[in-house]
């Protein structure tokens, strides 16, 4: 049975416990950092990271979810594009790096923060998770799935979920993912390869539609390469940074079910 993101969040407490048991024993965790890029100059909703949700800014809710998932505040970094976000995160004891507000994408912001953290901590990180700053109800299990796909060798990893609300199919604010699935595998182990992401209704014909969830994993070498590439034509046209990776021939793995 497929679960929506909202349904997943109802199981948060048990998932945090289960994920921490796996994560804290993992060798991958020693070489991994989770970064949350955030800036105030959003096109559709300016100042979104500071939007009040039950008395606290959205970015704080996201940060708390991620810290609960990985079990270590030291491995969670907010890559801020504005001093206002820095002030908020410092007030709650979060690690935060001020980055250039003119960087072209969240991934570029993540990379900038990564370099600073490696310098501060004296470590060389191998895996990077990018959690978008507008996911205040993020289920912790989704971070685990993103990490596991990196261990399978994809350049990048991300998540999709089947669209169950028909009104989302034609909504340009709901990014659709076109995925090639390994049909020979069982549903529990099936891994897909992202072919394209679009704000349009795609693909045509009968069959399910999938919406993209704003979390990415990167092999360090893949992120290094990504940030050396200029914003691609399709990235600029769709306003979707992951298209830069696809146009450059990089692979983005996605799990079949979340």
Where are these regions (language model features)?
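Catalytic donor-sugar/metal-binding loop of nucleotide-sugar-dependent glycosyltransferases
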Residues: 221, 242-258
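Donor nucleotide-sugar recognition loop
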Residues: 230-240
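Low-complexity, intrinsically disordered or signal/transmembrane-proximal segments
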Residues: 7, 23-24
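Short aromatic/basic micro-patch
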Residues: 44, 137, 217, 239
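N-terminal glycine-rich phosphate-binding loop and ensuing alpha1 helix
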Residues: 27-80
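Short phosphate-binding loop-to-helix
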Residues: 77, 83-131, 135-145
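Conserved core of the sugar-phosphate nucleotidyltransferase
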Residues: 138-232
């Amino acid at each position: 049975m497929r679960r929506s993101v909202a349904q997943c969040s109802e199981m948060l407490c048990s998932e945090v416990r289960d994920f921490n048991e796996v994560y804290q024993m993992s060798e991958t965790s020693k070489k991994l950092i989770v970064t949350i890029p955030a800036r105030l100059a959003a096109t559709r909703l300016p100042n979104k990271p500071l939007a009040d949700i039950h008395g606290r800014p959205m970015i704080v809710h996201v940060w708390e979810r991620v810290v609960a998932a990985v079990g270590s505040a030291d491995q969670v970094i907010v890559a801020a594009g504005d001093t206002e976000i820095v002030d908020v995160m410092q007030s709650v004891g979060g690690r935060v790096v001020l980055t250039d507000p003119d960087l072209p994408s969240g991934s570029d912001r993540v990379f900038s923060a990564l370099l600073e953290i490696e310098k501060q901590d004296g470590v060389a990180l191998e895996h990077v998770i990018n959690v978008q700053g507008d996911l205040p109800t993020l289920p912790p299990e989704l971070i685990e799935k993103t990490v596991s796909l990196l261990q399978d060798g994809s350049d990048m990893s991300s998540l999709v979920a089947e669209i169950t609300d028909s009104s989302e199919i034609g909504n340009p604010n709901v990014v659709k993912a076109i995925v090639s699935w390994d049909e020979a595998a069982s549903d529990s182990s099936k891994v897909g390869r992202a072919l394209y992401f679009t704000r349009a209704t795609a693909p045509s014909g009968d069959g399910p539609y999938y919406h993209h969830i704003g979390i990415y994993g990167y092999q360090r070498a893949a992120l290094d390469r990504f940030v050396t590439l200029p914003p691609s034509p399709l990235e600029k046209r769709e306003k979707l940074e992951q298209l830069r990776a696809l146009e450059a021939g990089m692979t983005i793995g996605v799990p079949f079910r979340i």
